């Protein structure tokens, strides 16, 4: 049975275009990109994406947010409900976690980053607001569910 997230009847965001999750980033690490593409295929079968959300994979080690801080992943939540959101994930530091952990654990950290930002996406869809409350737990549950369906990320 597919455990699809049920959205509220009245969403804050406007699904004015085709929904879905799109992965962009040909310059990212091949291992990371392939793992995120496989994870995204599974996500599309298990969850709903009523507003299109592109995921940009950056070849840099870290990203600079709108506020000037650095992060490994970000979610852009537009102020208007009819503007498309997006997620950015830095993949340039794949060699660093790969040196200290095995391949699966290193890739799982990127999948967790994507799941974390997707929880923010669903918060934005529902309410237009974003909070960190419960996000880590929900993201971990998403990655754990995916881990039950695959041998390696």
PLM regions with names:
Residues 32-52:
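Zn2+-dependent metallopeptidase catalytic core
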Residues 130-153:
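Post-HExxH zinc-binding segment in Zn-dependent metallohydrolases
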Residues 57-64:
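Acidic helix-start/capping segments at beta-turn-to-alpha-helix junctions
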Residues 65-107, 121:
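Active-site scaffold of zinc-dependent metalloenzymes
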Residues 112-125:
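Active-site recognition of the HExxH zinc-binding catalytic motif
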Residues 1-22, 26-31:
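Pan-zinc metallopeptidase signature
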Residues 50, 125, 149-153:
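Short, polar/charged, Gly/Pro-enriched helix-capping and turn/loop motifs at alpha-helix termini
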Residues 107-111, 133:
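Alpha-helical scaffolds flanking conserved acidic
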